[in-house]
Each structure stands twice: as C-alpha cells, then as structure tokens.
C-alpha cells in the first residue's frame, strides 16, 4: 500500500506537470517551426517569385503591379502570397486581414527561420526573402488552417484557471480511486472497533484481506479480539466458579447458625452472623447474575413491549415505597413500545435502579418514560444525598462505594448498578448518573427501539 500510494502520488504529480508544461506547446495558435516539406515549398516559391520579378522589368510608375503579377502567378492553389516592402507596405493583403498580418509580421521577421501560426481559420507562414535587384522583400504565405482549433480548446489556453480546473478533473478519478482504496479498509476497521466498544467480541475475517498494511492491522485486531474474548471468558468462569465454591461454606454457616439458635436461643451475635450471611448470600447471587449477563450467549432475546415488561416492577416498587412511608410517582408510564432483548435482564435492570432510589431517597421517588424515533429513555429520580460528579461514572463499577452515605448498612452488595450497566450495554443501550431535579440522584437508561427490517 505504501508503494502504491507513493507511485500514484508521483504519477498524478507527473501528469499534472506534463499537462501544465506541454499543453501550451500544443496550442496551434502559438508560433511553431515549419515542417521540412513546408520549408522546401517556401524556398521553391521564393525562387519562382525572384525569377518572375527578374523577367519582368520594373516600371517606376506602376512598380507594384509586377509584384502582384508575380505573387498571383506562383501562389499555391487555395493560398495567397504576400510581399512586405522594406518600408513595411504589404502587397496582396485584404483589408480585413491586416490586423493578423501585422501581428504575425511583428513576431516572424527573420527569413533565416521562417515559422507559422494559426489565426482562427487562417494560417500564416514565413517570412522568406525575395531579392528584386537592389530591393529586398519579405514573402509570406497565407492559407486556410488544416483543422480549426475548437473554441473550448482556445478557451482553455486563454484561461489558466479553467485549464487548472480541467487538469484537476482529469486527475480526480485516479485520486478518488486512491482515497476509496484507503477509506474502505479503514472504514471496516472502524466498524469492527465500534462493535468491540459495544462489547461484541467477534472475529472479522474481512479485515484480513486487502492492502498489506491493513491486512496486518486486521490480523492484529482479530488477535486482540481473541485475546479479549479469552480473557473475558476466563474472568467470567473464575467469577462463576468462586461464587459456586462460596455456596458450600455459606450453606454450612447458615446451617450451623440455625443449630446454634436452637441450642442457645436468640442473641445479638447470632443475629449479626445471620445478617452478614444473608448479605454474603445476596452478593453471591448478584455475582452469578452479573456473570451470566456478561456471557452474551446466555441471553435469550425476544420482542417485548415496554409496558408489559416493566409495569409489574413499578407496581411492586409503589407497594414497597408505601410500606416505607415514601412517595413513589410514575409521571409518564411506559407505553406499548417494542424492545428486543432478554426480558429478565431488562426487568432486572429497571428493578435495580428503582430499588437503588428506594434505598437512598428520603421521601420521594419519581419515574418517567419517554420515547422518540430511535429509542426509549427512562429517568429514575430520588431526593436522597446524591453522588458527587467525580463518582458518577465509578458507581457502575462492581463493589465501588462512595464515601458519603453509602456504607454497607444501606448500600447493599455494591453490585446492583454494575448489573444494570452490563444488562443495558448487552442490549446496545447506555446508562448514566446525573443530578436530579428532586435534589438527589438521577439514573437514566436509554434503550433502542426494535425496528423490523
């Protein structure tokens, strides 16, 4: 690819330079040298005219008539001869030709190097030197141009800017092909990178075809994806294995606590042990949920309507809020908007952020839904302590806790929002945290609408 770019660049540059340098020389309206045949013809005419004048004695009263007779006699068919005296008088010219004749005489006045030049449909040739005793005349030939140069070509030569534009248009296909050959594999690489950024770790064999440099980059990209996929799989397996292994000692701990209560009765120590065991059990459950969600293949997707998916979650949250003495309002309920995904994962995502609001709010929780042509937006607001701007991106990390008002007594396992982010990203959506109009935290979920293709 590097060699191709280099070659195309220099080829284009060479073509442009060649056009700029050579085109003016191809203008038939420029002074050009005579062909050998034209040179011989001119010398022959010159000799015939000299001989004719030598055979025709001069007449002082009508000296020009003998000049007319000579040039009329020896003019080639369809052409005319002109004689220019040493005083600059032109013999044999028509009035409407005087301007071009004077222009040509001003440029071609050396009989040792006769030239030719086009003027529209006419062409002038000369000069050739004719001796008439002590007088010397310049002999010129005026004839029809063999092929008239088109007005468009004349316009090109007369307008350098237009010539530059035409040159650019001529070179444009080559440059467009070069740009396309570079942009196509680069676009494929970008699309593949976007898929990886969205969590879709799959191989892209099409990246390993094309120019050598992009082929190598595509192979490296696929190797990176393979390594990431292997690492993610190992991490998920480790997380799942640890969670399952913790189940056995946790079950034994809960069983031992129950036996100890039977023997010794209730105590603060036993109550604390049961509380921590229950929290550990919840944490293990959350770890297993997150591990399953991160394994994309485990998510069985289907088409579901938003109101059918989330109405039960909202009803349960309203009931729990009433029991807690808090206000729970749904300002704009969900409609029958189509979503495509795993119902359990999507239901769990909304449930987690609603429970988060119930846990940290003082008295108010508000939920609103909106839809546009692209997707569904869900806002969950509370009037709790909120989260500082520097912590808003971090709260979606597993086990991350803010310093203020987020201790273990009120903060759950620290995995709820991580589960939310994983589930939403699995469905090509996003979740973010912001300030709430109620004074606390606003959690926003966006999910794309399902569109049949």
UniProtKB/Swiss-Prot annotation:
It catalyses: ATP + protein L-histidine = ADP + protein N-phospho-L-histidine. SMART domains: HAMP, HATPase_c, HisKA. Residues 180-233 form the HAMP domain. The keyword Zinc does not apply. The active site is at 244 (nucleophile). Keywords: ATP-binding, Cell adhesion, Cell inner membrane, Cell membrane, Kinase, Membrane, Nucleotide-binding, Phosphoprotein, Transferase, Transmembrane, Transmembrane helix, Two-component regulatory system. One of its GO terms (cellular component) is plasma membrane. Its EC number is 2.7.13.3. This is Sensor histidine kinase CpxA. Histidine kinase member of the two-component regulatory system CpxA/CpxR which responds to envelope stress response by activating or, in some cases, repressing expression of downstream genes. Activates CpxR by phosphorylation. SUPFAM superfamilies: ATPase domain of HSP90 chaperone/DNA topoisomerase II/histidine kinase, Homodimeric domain of signal transducing histidine kinase. It holds the Pfam family HATPase_c. It comes from Klebsiella pneumoniae subsp. pneumoniae (strain HS11286). The keyword Metal-binding does not apply. One of its GO terms (biological process) is cell adhesion. The two-component system is activated by envelope stress such as overexpression of some (misfolded) periplasmic proteins. It is found in: Cell inner membrane. Induction: Part of the putative cpxR-cpxA operon. The gene is cpxA.
